[in-house]
């Protein structure tokens, strides 16, 4: 069911991205038809160890310092937003793909079916989880759903820091999904298969897309088994063997200006895939009100928050999920 537009709560205009290295926030105005404009932005560095992404351990080890960083961002904004959309690191959640030949008509039945599927390989108790899902690819084998599962208390650590700074997190999403949102907003004609590699100080995430749909996602922490080269190779094999892929139309890399060993990461990806890669450029999706020339590392830091802010501006315009 879709609510009449006048009865809907307006989505947050501000998106904030919390990473192990910084807090970045943007406020976006505009529309898909008229174009999007960043009217405010701010980035506040974080000291090492304040945020440590983890699936099963505390993520925010020094909450007072994270709260202060958020307050500093609002000071640079010139005002404190009451509600924000929040981007958290990929490492705090598990992303799964489930497929059903027949999708239940009732949302409550679909909820239960997805929870039942997750119990088979859940990294923690379902009762302790915060779960969200959205429609993915639809094929002759059925309807696929992209499911995100995280411990409720760990997501709560990020939400609590926002609340303590004076801003309520009205929505929470993962970093790489919103880097992809920025890519799609900058090139809405994307139809073919493309690969996104999101390199961060704490690891890397790879996502295969078919047009706007996520077909594969894998995150590996920097202390996990194997390096980026192995992850790229495994992803390429999955693409060929399981997805029947015939080749990526584009390979895009984000995070390369901020991550340790960024140039090495680019060479690794190009060597493994045998083709050149492109940098994600969120400037294709938005303009900036101050018309300044932004350094690449700043643009890189703002990418995920730009992606989520745009997604919020367009929420509800493409039909219900």
Language-model segments: residues:
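Hydrophobic/aromatic-enriched cytosolic interaction surfaces used to assemble or bind macromolecules
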Residues: 1-321
């Amino acid at each position: 069911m879709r609510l009449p537009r006048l009865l809907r709560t307006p989505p947050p205009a501000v998106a904030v991205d919390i990473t192990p290295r910084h807090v970045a926030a943007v406020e976006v105005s505009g529309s898909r038809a008229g174009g999007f404009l960043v009217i405010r932005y701010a980035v506040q560095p974080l000291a090492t160890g304040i945020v440590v992404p983890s699936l099963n351990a505390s993520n925010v080890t020094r909450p007072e310092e994270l709260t202060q960083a958020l307050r500093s961002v609002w000071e640079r904004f010139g005002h404190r937003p009451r509600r924000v959309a929040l981007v958290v690191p990929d490492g705090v959640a598990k992303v799964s793909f489930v497929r059903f030949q027949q999708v239940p008509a009732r949302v409550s039945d679909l909820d239960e079916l997805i929870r039942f599927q997750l119990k088979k390989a859940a990294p923690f108790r379902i009762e302790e989880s915060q779960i969200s899902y959205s429609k993915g690819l639809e094929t002759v084998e059925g309807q696929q759903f992209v499911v995100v599962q995280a411990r409720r208390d760990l997501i709560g650590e990020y939400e609590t820091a926002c609340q303590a700074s004076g801003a309520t997190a009205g929505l929470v999403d993962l970093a790489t999904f919103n880097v992809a949102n920025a890519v799609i907003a900058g090139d809405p004609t994307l139809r073919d298969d493309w690969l996104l590699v999101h390199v961060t100080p704490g690891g890397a995430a790879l996502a295969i897309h078919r047009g706007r749909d996520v077909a594969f996602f894998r995150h590996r922490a920097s202390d996990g088994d194997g390096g980026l080269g192995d992850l790229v190779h495994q992803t390429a094999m999955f693409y060929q063997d399981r997805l029947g892929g015939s080749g990526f139309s584009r390979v895009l890399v984000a995070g390369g200006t901020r991550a340790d060993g960024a140039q090495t990461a680019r060479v690794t990806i190009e060597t493994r895939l045998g083709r050149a890669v492109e940098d994600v450029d969120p400037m294709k999706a938005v303009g900036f009100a101050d018309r300044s020339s932004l350094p690449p590392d700043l643009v890189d830091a703002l990418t995920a928050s730009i992606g989520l802010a745009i997604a919020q501006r367009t929420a509800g315009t493409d039909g219900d999920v």
